[in-house]
């Protein structure tokens, strides 16, 4: 069985909340999802890629503006091959500020942070998440607003599947 992870990251990728605020938000996330398996906070000294695992379905190139579907179940899927290579690169590249990647659509190199992951991935220095929250509805607007108030920033939701 796969794991579902609700990830919450600041819309401002450079925003990092106070440690106490992050811990309060983590505790509240556990209250919101009492059946969830593990709530976590993660801080980073630099911007990191926040992935969605197998939920990544589409990217849009920042250079040629073409959208490309990513289907790992389709044989010889160029988008999926590109994603697997990128995933390896991201795990071994400590500096996303200078990382350029070859785009599968136009063959040109784009800054990784300029690629549009169509809402299913992001970049951030802070992440709040809960594993297997067991909620079909996700987080409500009221709950999201409460977490945003504690952390002092607007949040973006990313659902990941591993």
Question: Over which residues does each language-model region extend?
Answer:
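N-terminal alpha-helical interaction blocks
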Residues: 1-59
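Acidic, proline/glycine-rich low-complexity IDRs
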Residues: 1-5, 105-107, 111-162
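A structural detector for beta-sheet-dominated domains
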Residues: 9-11, 44, 62, 69-73, ...
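Short, charged/polar micro-motifs that form catalytic or ligand-binding hotspots
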Residues: 50-54, 92, 96, 133, ...
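Generic beta-strand structural signal
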Residues: 57, 99, 124-126
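Short cysteine-rich clusters marking metal-coordination/redox-active sites
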Residues: 61-64, 103-106
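Short recognition patches in nucleic-acid-associated and regulatory proteins
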Residues: 66-93
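Short linker/helix segments within small regulatory modules
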Residues: 83-101, 117-120
């Amino acid at each position: 069985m796969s794991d579902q992870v609700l990830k919450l990251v600041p819309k401002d990728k450079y925003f990092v909340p106070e440690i106490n605020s992050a811990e309060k938000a983590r505790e509240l996330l556990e209250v919101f999802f009492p059946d969830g398996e593990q709530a976590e906070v993660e801080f980073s000294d630099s911007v990191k890629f926040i992935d969605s695992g197998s939920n990544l379905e589409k990217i849009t190139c920042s250079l040629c503006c073409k959208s490309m579907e990513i289907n790992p179940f389709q044989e010889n899927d160029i988008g999926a091959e590109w994603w697997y290579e990128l995933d390896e690169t991201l795990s071994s590249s400590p500096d996303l500020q200078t990382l350029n990647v070859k785009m599968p659509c136009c063959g040109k190199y784009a800054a990784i942070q300029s690629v549009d992951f169509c809402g299913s991935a992001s970049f951030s220095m802070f992440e709040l998440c809960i594993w297997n929250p067991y909620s079909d509805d996700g987080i409500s607007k009221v709950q999201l607003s409460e977490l945003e108030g504690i952390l002092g920033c607007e949040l973006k939701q990313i659902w990941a599947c591993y």
